[in-house]
Design a protein with these regions (language model features):
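A short, proline-enriched helix->beta-strand linker immediately N-terminal to the Walker B motif
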Residues: 189-193
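Helix-to-loop junction immediately C-terminal to a conserved catalytic motif
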Residues: 84
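Conserved ABC ATPase "signature" region
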Residues: 16, 33-42, 99-100, 141, ...
């Protein structure tokens, strides 16, 4: 499961977007001014403009993985490109560690990308004439690092992503999953604080995609990066995210934790994604537990489960108990009780 973002880290917004718009078309700025920020995608389309991002405001906290999810054309990749300034916004403000991204000079922007941002895209974009090691070392050499230092760092990254033994292979000798590992290692070689990933696994076969998701979660557990991850796959979003932002027609329909989105979809559009989601695979014990109330220790089972544990991982153990199970926090303090009836209802109540 994704890492949990502490309340302390939530105070530190690494990325902040304030009323960001991206509208394509010759009359984009004029149309936006005329609309006074109340953008109607159909009206803009009739005027020859395409709305990519419509008044996006949110923050991404230190160490958080925010997954931006939506169907094709929803604006999710455009939003990522605005935040990395691969695409210029039409209006709004973007801040990276409190600095105004849109006010940076070209030199400052290049320096920011080289030292603070790592990017991975659906296309592996490996250099075919370079080996695994040379591909990983390439951004370090562009920065001006020595060949020796670059190669030593590349060796570390190759080992980190499970490519040790294949350092001297060329891209054509690797599978799709292995090629994407090279792309991931290359993006991490510069030790970025912020990691942008735009549908990095969507071109892979389902089994390889699952393997890469597992690897990605392992890496995040080790590196604790601030991540903006784009996908069109709701299951992938649920599996990876600390929070999910669901987009439609350039608008963020809802931004919340996976559990809250499944339990409390904000719009009918969001609800369509959540209807078929098995609740036990998403919800944790905290989201379905009851208060202790008048329950005494003798009324409780000896079994204890973490409040962060996903129901699917503990349901068998909970259902084997005759008494309510204590739900505990990271300090082993009892914060609630999980009743068998709640778990049974979650598993079978809507079937």
């Amino acid at each position: 499961m994704p890492s949990k973002v502490s309340s302390d880290k939530k105070k530190n917004a690494v990325i902040k977007c304030d009323s960001v718009y991206k509208i394509f078309g010759d009359n984009a700025k004029k149309m936006l001014q005329k609309s006074n920020g109340n953008v109607d995608a159909k009206e803009f389309q009739d005027a020859g403009c395409v709305v990519g991002v419509n008044s996006a405001s949110f923050e991404v906290y230190e160490g958080e993985m925010l997954v931006v999810m939506g169907l094709s054309g929803s604006g999710k990749s455009t939003l990522l490109r605005c935040i990395s300034r691969l695409t210029d916004t039409t209006a709004g403000n973007i801040y990276i560690d409190g600095k105004d991204l849109l006010a940076l000079s070209d030199k400052e922007l290049i320096n920011l990308r080289r030292n603070k941002m790592g990017m991975v895209f659906q296309s592996f974009a490996l250099l075919p004439h370079k080996t695994v090691l040379e591909n990983i070392a390439f951004p370090l050499q562009v920065k001006g690092n020595s060949t020796k230092d670059s190669m030593n760092r590349a060796l570390e990254m190759a080992k980190l992503v499970g490519l040790d033994g294949r350092e001297n292979y060329f891209p054509r000798q690797l599978s799709g999953g292995q090629q994407q590992r090279v792309g991931i290692a290359r993006s991490l070689a510069v030790e970025p604080d912020i990691w942008f990933l735009d549908e990095p696994f969507s071109a892979l076969d389902p089994l390889i995609r699952k393997e890469m998701q597992d690897e990605f979660l392992r890496l995040q557990g080790v590196l604790n990066k601030t991540i903006l991850f784009v996908t069109h796959d709701f299951d992938e979003a649920l599996r990876l995210a600390d929070r999910i932002a669901i987009m439609k027609d350039g608008i963020i329909e809802q931004i919340d934790t996976p559990a809250n989105i499944v339990l409390n979809p904000a719009t009918e559009y969001v609800a369509k994604f959540t209807r078929e989601v098995p609740r036990e695979k998403v919800l944790n014990c905290e989201s379905v537990m009851d208060e202790i109330g008048d329950l005494a220790d003798s009324d409780m089972s000896q079994l204890r489960v973490s409040k962060d544990a996903i129901i699917e991982t503990v349901c068998e153990a909970v259902l084997s108990e005759q008494k309510p199970v204590a739900v505990v926090d990271k300090n082993d303090k009892v914060v609630g009780a999980l009743h068998c009836s709640k778990v049974i209802h979650m598993l079978f109540g809507s079937k």
